[in-house]
Amino acid sequence: MNKTQQQLLINAIHTIPDYPVEGIMFRDVTSLLEDAEAFKLVMELLENKYKGRGFTKIVGTEARGFLFGAPLALALNIGFIPVRKPGKLPRPTYSQAYQLEYGEDILEIHQDALTPEDNVLIIDDLLATGGTIEATTKLIRRLGAQVQEAGFVISLPDLGGEERLAELNITPYSLIQYQGE
């Protein structure tokens, strides 16, 4: 990504202070989605990064991971698997509790969504503490699938998510990093 492209993405992502709780600087990717040029650029950059890498499925985390994971799956001609909050998936599920930077939650995946033959790429909008991706990784591995990489639009390196993913042997990649926030 060149500097012009990077600046386009930075300009398209709005920062909302003290949301959802005081002390959080929320990076709003929904503003990026409103900018067709920026959204298209994100999808092209992710496609170029991951095409031809042998992934068989993309797992996207609720909810903003769906916004980038599903179109990327289409571009790569592979399936998309949603990981959702409790009670949102109709077939039998596995659940995993996790901590996030401003609370606690649970994620679920369909029990039949993946097989040991699957090589999975996780996609989400933002990497902060890594709790969401740790829970997602545990769900994927519980189904026997392989997962070693996760892609993000934004990462906040100072919150420790990259280190947390390294402990899980997950290599993170992000388009934009916000240091010191």
Swiss-Prot record:
Keywords of the record, alphabetical order, are: Cytoplasm, Glycosyltransferase, Purine salvage, Transferase
Q: Is Lipoprotein a UniProt keyword of this protein?
A: no
- CDD domains, per this entry? PRTases_typeI (cd06223)
Quaternary assembly: Homodimer.
- InterPro entries the record matches: Ade_phspho_trans, PRibTrfase_dom, PRTase-like, UPRTase/APRTase
Q: Which GO terms describe its biological process?
A: adenine salvage; AMP salvage; purine ribonucleoside salvage
Q: What catalytic activity does the UniProt entry give for this protein?
A: AMP + diphosphate = 5-phospho-alpha-D-ribose 1-diphosphate + adenine
Q: Pathway of this protein?
A: Purine metabolism; AMP biosynthesis via salvage pathway; AMP from adenine: step 1/1
Give me the Gene Ontology terms describing cellular component: cytoplasm
Q: What HAMAP family does this protein's entry cite?
A: Aden_phosphoribosyltr (MF_00004)
Work out whether the entry's keyword set contains Nucleotide-binding. no
Q: What does this protein do?
A: Catalyzes a salvage reaction resulting in the formation of AMP, that is energically less costly than de novo synthesis.
Q: Tell me its family.
A: Belongs to the purine/pyrimidine phosphoribosyltransferase family.
Q: Which Pfam families match?
A: Pribosyltran
**Identification of the protein by name:** Adenine phosphoribosyltransferase
Q: Which PROSITE patterns match?
A: PUR_PYR_PR_TRANSFER (PS00103)
Output the superkingdom of the source species: Bacteria
**Single GO molecular function:** adenine phosphoribosyltransferase activity
Instruction: Kindly list the places in or outside the cell where this protein is found, as annotated in its UniProt entry.
Output: Cytoplasm
Give EC number(s), comma-separated: 2.4.2.7
